[in-house]
């Protein structure tokens, strides 16, 4: 299993080009199933989750391929509506194929998802909405079996989500585009990735209003056609690299990004003492001295994003004073705390709140990545630490950060990917 070996005391500085957002690319790929003619999607990141979803879509008999950062999809060859456990178990977003399959073909069988250690993240809101649209839903042996009402078409309805759910909003929005009649969705997620999905659906011929608000109105159409579309830049990748500048008195410019998508995070960076400058498609963070302490509460968009919580906690660990972070989106999202404490951080967790007392520096230590965003917080902490840090289970970071070693090296981080099993085998061969 691969590990990162990072030699610390780096000053993170330079320019880095931001990739397309994984959290936008996945629902966009799923939405391609709706189109009766070929679709082209640009700025698609090369990530494990993307490869998994492409493999799942190809398993339906659909012609789909990725060349560079472009994915093309032709659904005319579809053979089945079945998403097996072997693929879905590794990634929660696989459930997003349920909506388009059900809406376009009237039936679907999709394994219940896996792939995430952050709390329960139930899919009940997806299923509840599909039932409200007339679908017959059964869950048997770990699979969701869905069938549209007689006539093979979902029926528009009024539905209010019991909680703000990004995946639920996306799945139901996708399905509603081909429903008979009008669907009104209340308490929708407003994340930029949801907006990106709605915009692509409109480009395919869908009729969606209220984009970017908590209420979406979708007038169903008979069919959707393919289009050419580009994935929105990854705001979380952007924030992650900028956070590195704050931890190392660095100077980082992120290119091919959108400052408008990251305002709550940039505001906190400025509170912590960073100088933030922006252009149409770039953000620069300059830092001198130690960060100032801040208080952070994760909230649905447009609040502070939960996906930046771990990275900001790592910055707070080096602040000159005491910070507090309240995690209000997911339970069990402080799994990185024990690992940061192994590196010398002073953190106490009480329920949903973490109290972080700043220390002068991190110390190198062997640590383990526990989820995607936690893994990046450990990478940045290791870059700031004194000595060599070995980070285990880095497959998490490969799920969400494209070309991460190359980008970090370009910013001055001394990072190497190592494989203990392979390295040991090579050492044994030298002894023969």
Curated annotation (Swiss-Prot):
Pathway: Cell wall biogenesis; peptidoglycan biosynthesis. Phosphoenolpyruvate binds at residues 22-23. The keyword Cell division applies. The modification 2-(S-cysteinyl)pyruvic acid O-phosphothioketal is found at residue 116. Signal peptide: none annotated. The keyword Protease does not apply. It catalyses: phosphoenolpyruvate + UDP-N-acetyl-alpha-D-glucosamine = UDP-N-acetyl-3-O-(1-carboxyvinyl)-alpha-D-glucosamine + phosphate. GO terms for molecular function: UDP-N-acetylglucosamine 1-carboxyvinyltransferase activity. InterPro entries: Enolpyruvate_Tfrase_dom (IPR001986), Enolpyruvate_Tfrase_sf (IPR036968), MurA_subfamily (IPR050068), RNA3'P_cycl/enolpyr_Trfase_a/b (IPR013792), UDP_GlcNAc_COvinyl_MurA (IPR005750). CDD domains: UdpNAET. Its EC number is 2.5.1.7. It is found in: Cytoplasm. One of its GO terms (biological process) is cell division. Its main location: cytoplasm. GO terms for cellular component: cytoplasm. HAMAP family: MurA (MF_00111). Cell wall formation. Adds enolpyruvyl to UDP-N-acetylglucosamine. This is UDP-N-acetylglucosamine 1-carboxyvinyltransferase. It comes from Psychrobacter sp. (strain PRwf-1).
